[in-house]
């Protein structure tokens, strides 16, 4: 029996990444809503701000232990070539720094440790995030280039039955789409991290942060949605 939309939603939300993307959507919708009404409806803006902050803190709690994900990825599947393995070490190391120091950022913001540490923890976490995601983007670009070459060969191949070629083409196209979604999410998160590392009018504008957050969340929805 195939899964319907409700079944898929239940499976999606059962995943830690699934609930994270839902709460991330709440966080950045609230950020944009707060910005939209802050001049005309300060009470509503305050409520949206509280929703944004609560969502952000909830996401940090959900990510407890996520620093082990990158370590396990390197341990189990470091990459097929020396170049990919090297890039994977850089990418996952950056992500591990991001998630590890994000734990301390969360603890400082809820008052469990010195609140003065929040700014330093936020900077280190954002630096690790931007470093790691830069290399994840490079890895995805390399794989997309390889997939496009394979796709071109298959489209001109006459050695296999059309059904098999069609299935392989569909699989390659699906992988390309997933990697494009990954690049979209990582670029969006990179902009958010840059706003913390090197504040500037573009990256720190509410519209930039809000749209980047939603792009990242919705790309994650697409990638984690059950097939």
Swiss-Prot record:
Name the protein family.
Belongs to the peroxin-11 family.
Cited Pfam families: PEX11
What is this protein's name?
Peroxisomal membrane protein 11B
Say if the entry is tagged with keyword Oxidoreductase.
no
- For the keyword Oxidoreductase, the answer is no
Where in or outside the cell? Peroxisome membrane
What triggers or suppresses the expression of this protein? In seedlings by transition from dark to light. Up-regulated during senescence.
GO BP terms: namely:
peroxisome fission; peroxisome organization; regulation of peroxisome size
Q: In which tissues is it expressed?
A: Expressed in roots, leaves and developing siliques.
The membrane spanning regions, by residue number, are 86-106, 202-222
Q: Which residues lie on this side of the membrane: Lumenal?
A: 107-201
UniProt-listed InterPro entries: PEX11 (IPR008733)
List the source organism: Arabidopsis thaliana
Quaternary form? Answer: Homooligomer. Interacts with ARC5 and FIS1B on peroxisomes.
Q: Which GO terms describe its molecular function?
A: identical protein binding
Q: How does it sit in the membrane?
A: Multi-pass membrane protein
* Intervals, Cytoplasmic compartment: 1-85, 223-227
UniProt function note: Involved in peroxisomal proliferation. Promotes peroxisomal duplication, aggregation or elongation without fission.
Q: Name one GO cellular component term.
A: peroxisomal membrane
Q: What are the alphabetically sorted keywords of the record?
A: Membrane, Peroxisome, Peroxisome biogenesis, Transmembrane, Transmembrane helix
């Amino acid at each position: 029996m195939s899964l319907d939309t409700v079944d898929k939603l239940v499976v999606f939300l059962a995943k830690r990444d699934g609930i994270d993307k839902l709460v991330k959507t709440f966080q950045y919708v609230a950020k944009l809503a707060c910005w939209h009404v802050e001049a005309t409806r300060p009470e509503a803006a305050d409520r949206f701000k509280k929703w944004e902050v609560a969502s952000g803190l909830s996401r940090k709690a959900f990510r407890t232990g996520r620093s082990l994900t990158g370590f396990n990825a390197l341990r189990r599947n470091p990459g097929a070539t020396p170049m990919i393995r090297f890039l994977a070490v850089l990418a996952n190391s950056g992500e591990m720094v991001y998630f590890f120091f994000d734990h301390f950022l969360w603890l400082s913001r809820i008052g469990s440790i010195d609140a003065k540490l929040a700014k330093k923890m936020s900077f280190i976490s954002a630096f690790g995030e931007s470093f790691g995601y830069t290399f994840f983007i490079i890895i995805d670009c390399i794989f997309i280039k390889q997939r496009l070459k394979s796709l071109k060969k298959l489209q001109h191949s006459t050695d296999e039955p059309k059904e098999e070629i069609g299935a392989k083409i569909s699989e390659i196209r699906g992988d390309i789409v997933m990697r494009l979604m990954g690049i979209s999410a990582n670029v969006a998160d990179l902009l958010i991290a840059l706003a913390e590392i090197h504040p500037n009018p573009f990256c720190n504008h509410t519209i930039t942060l809000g749209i980047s957050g939603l792009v990242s969340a919705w790309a994650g929805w697409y990638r984690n949605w059950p097939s």
